Amino acid sequence: MSQTIRPSSVFDSVRTPFHVSTADGIDLIGEVSAPKGESKGAILCLHPLPTAGGMMDSHVYKKAANRLPAMTGITVVRFNTRGTTSEAGTSTGEFDNGKSEKFDVEAMLSYCFDHLKLENVWVTGWSFGTDLALQHAKDPRHKEGILWLLGASK
C-alpha cells in the first residue's frame, strides 16, 4: 500500500458493530474492523480509564481500527468496558475500578475466539487497559500482550 497516511486517514475494511453479554449480565458494545481478505491476526484493545475520558474510540485505537486492517491484514476488536460511553454507544453497568471489568475482559476474549474464530490474538492495554490486561487477560489462547504504561506528570 503506497498511500499517504494523514491524521484523518480511514482505509477500507469490514466494520461490524456488536453486543456481547458478560457472565454477570452486562451488555458490552464494540466494533470489529477486519481486513477484506484473510486476517493474519488480531488485537483486542483495552482502553484507558473511562473516568478520565478513556473509551473504545480513544484516538490511538480508533486510528488502529481505521488503518491496520487494510495496511497489515490485522483485525482490530474494540469495545467499551462497563459503564463507558463513546460515539459508538454505551455499555451497561457501572465502572468498578478494574474489579468487575474482569468479566468484560473474559467475555471479550471468549467472543474473539469462540464467536469470531480469530487466531493469533494479542491483547493491547493502554493505561487503565494495561491494568485490565495484566489482571484479567488469563485466557491461554491469546498470544501475548502489548502494554502501554503511560502516565501523566506535572
Name each model-derived stretch.
Residues 1-41:
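N-terminal cap/lid segment of alpha/beta-hydrolase-fold proteins
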Residues 35-78:
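Short, surface-exposed "cap/lid" segments of acyl-processing enzymes
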Residues 48, 74, 79-84, 88-89, ...:
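Active-site loop/turn elements of alpha/beta-hydrolase fold enzymes
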Residues 53-55, 82-96:
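Cap/lid segment of the alpha/beta-hydrolase catalytic domain
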Residues 94-115:
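Alpha/beta-hydrolase active-site loop
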Residues 120-125, 150:
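Short beta-strand immediately N-terminal to the catalytic nucleophile in serine-hydrolase-like folds
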Residues 125-133:
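Gly/Ala-rich beta-loop-alpha elbow adjacent to hydrolase catalytic centers
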Residues 142-154:
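A conserved short beta-strand
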